[in-house]
Curated annotation (Swiss-Prot):
Source lineage: Eukaryota, Viridiplantae, Streptophyta, Embryophyta, Tracheophyta
Name recorded for this polypeptide: NAD(P)H dehydrogenase (quinone) FQR1
Phenotype when the gene is knocked out: No visible phenotype under normal growth conditions, but mutant plants have increased resistance to the necrotrophic fungus Botrytis cinerea.
Keywords: Cell membrane, Flavoprotein, FMN, Membrane, NAD, NADP, Nucleotide-binding, Oxidoreductase, Stress response
Function: Catalyzes the transfer of electrons from NADH and NADPH to several quinones in vitro. May act as detoxification enzyme, and protect against auxin-induced oxidative stress.
Names of the cofactor(s): FMN
Amino acid sequence: MATKVYIVYYSMYGHVEKLAEEIRKGAASVEGVEAKLWQVPETLHEEALSKMSAPPKSESPIITPNELAEADGFVFGFPTRFGMMAAQFKAFLDATGGLWRAQALAGKPAGIFYSTGSQGGGQETTALTAITQLVHHGMLFVPIGYTFGAGMFEMENVKGGSPYGAGTFAGDGSRQPTELELQQAFHQGQYIASITKKLKGSTA
């Protein structure tokens, strides 16, 4: 039976989504792993999104809280809002009370990735504050650490991400994820999928 890894994200302008796509590719590259992209529901009205010049949403399906229980592992992604995850993703997690009550996600591995507007915009604080959500569900936080190797020490060019997970900087919105950031995202997907597969195999 395939190991299921769900990449669940919220993306307003597409930066997080691009990382999510690479993470899915990385996870799917692990033999025996089925990787699937999911979006969390939008909480803003179309009128508000239009005023914010947000592009149309992608075709990735909208996930419901109960569908989380189907997966063996996760990678959660979101843009940063004042050093924390975006409210849309927090609203989705707030709706997982039934799963929490049953501890349906306990023992399942999960990683985190993110996008911020600037280098001091809260990439690590976003990950740190998001970990509390995993803890209450009994999930296992899987950081990438320095497993990405030399790419973690890039100093010549601006690069998002950290030992906590893959990341990118959006700037004024015109900056897109770099090739190195996308490579780090692919690595994160591959890394977490491998760990998820091992954990599932040890409990089979």
